[in-house]
Amino acid sequence: VVAFPTETFYGLAALATDYQAIDKLYQLKKRPAQKSLSILIADPAELDDWIETIPNQALHLTARFWPGPLTLVFDAATHLPTNLTADTGKIGVRISSHPVAQALVREVGAPITATSANRSKSPSCRSAGEVISQLGSDLEAILDAGLTPGGKVSTIADVTTRLPKILRIGAIAAQEVFSCWEQDA
């Protein structure tokens, strides 16, 4: 498990196809097993490999907001580890706009987890030092790119229904998501 910077806070990366690495991440964060994890991909063209279907309106959202702080929740491909999806059958996906996060995903050549680099219910970390103070030597590495901007977390929208369901308000306003979705409704 590796800590890395994003356009908001530091995140934790584990290979999204590695059941044991995902388990280690859950233990490290002390995250409840019933809370699923999101993934970062390098390119929207990779979506087909990790999800079941892409609603046309979701393509408008990816074109407008990716890379950036919008996580879209899709029906997960059946080959994904069940501990990644918390057995929900759904997976959150996004593309980070941070160059280090993008380089990490490209270098790994597969999706990585996208969860905040902190213990569950603890404040999000903006620096490598904050990550060390919360997670210490339990990490394999920290990709230190200095202070992240912080601010609002990513917005999470479930696009498996007729209209998107906003699961978490963050850097992108709900109205922006709905307006973009309705372009092709």
What do these predicted regions represent?
Residues V1-A185:
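Active-site-adjacent structural elements in enzyme catalytic cores
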